[in-house]
């Protein structure tokens, strides 16, 4: 099985990066530094996103990822993100908030989808699980926007993530910040920052299914680099 990448040009008819830049420009012209509730999946993906957005937003960085297992892996990723926020210089220092960790939330969501290939419906439901919790928390806290770091990954479907975010905006009445953070060399910059800060870079997304798929690819000599 070959690796599937969502580079943007093939999947996205809208340019979410340009939409984000327009929002940033409008807020800057108005002299606003909006409050952003940012769902973070891991330190490497968050590195560039935090570097970029902290120039324009006051960020609460929300680590809610019940998909990650085992617990030791979850703890390791949590610590790395906390360390990154402590060590990186920021114009507006992000606040770190850890969500609850209950893997049963993920397994209940994935029920019946255990054999669906990576990048399919199970992943889309996982996107929604995490984004919905972020939207709820953002609405409860009176934030101006919510979004996720997930769109930085070449393995994640940015169009689907933005569509889910826009659906949740209508439900929870808090603005979704459009993004495709892999654009403008965002993913490349995240790898540079990961090296600079010596970040732990995991080789699977987080769930048992992605771990199993990664191990199968390794055994067959098929890796995504």
Language-model features: where?
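Nucleotide-activated chemistry modules centered on ATP-dependent adenylation/adenylyltransferase
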Residues: 2-225
């Amino acid at each position: 099985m070959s690796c599937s990448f969502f580079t943007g040009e093939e999947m996205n008819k809208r340019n979410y990066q340009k939409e984000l830049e327009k929002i940033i420009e409008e807020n800057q012209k108005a002299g606003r530094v909006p409050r952003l509730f940012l769902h973070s999946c891991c330190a490497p993906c968050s590195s560039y996103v935090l570097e970029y957005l902290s120039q324009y937003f006051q960020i609460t960085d929300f680590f809610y990822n019940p998909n990650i297992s085992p617990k030791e892996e979850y703890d390791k990723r949590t610590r790395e993100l906390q360390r990154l926020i402590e060590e990186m210089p920021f114009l507006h220092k992000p606040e770190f908030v850890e969500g609850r960790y209950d893997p049963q939330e993920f397994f209940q969501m994935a029920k019946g989808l255990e054999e669906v290939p990576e990048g399919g419906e199970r992943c889309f439901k996982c996107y929604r699980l995490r984004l919905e919790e972020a939207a709820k928390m953002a609405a409860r806290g009176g934030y101006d926007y919510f979004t996720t770091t997930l769109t930085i990954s070449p393995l994640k479907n940015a169009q689907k993530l933005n569509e889910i975010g826009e659906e949740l905006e209508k439900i929870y009445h808090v603005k979704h910040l459009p993004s495709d953070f892999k654009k403008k060399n965002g993913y490349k910059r995240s790898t540079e920052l990961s090296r600079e800060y010596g970040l732990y870079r995991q080789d699977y997304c987080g769930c048992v299914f992605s771990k199993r798929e990664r191990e199968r690819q390794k055994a067959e000599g098929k890796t995504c680099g």
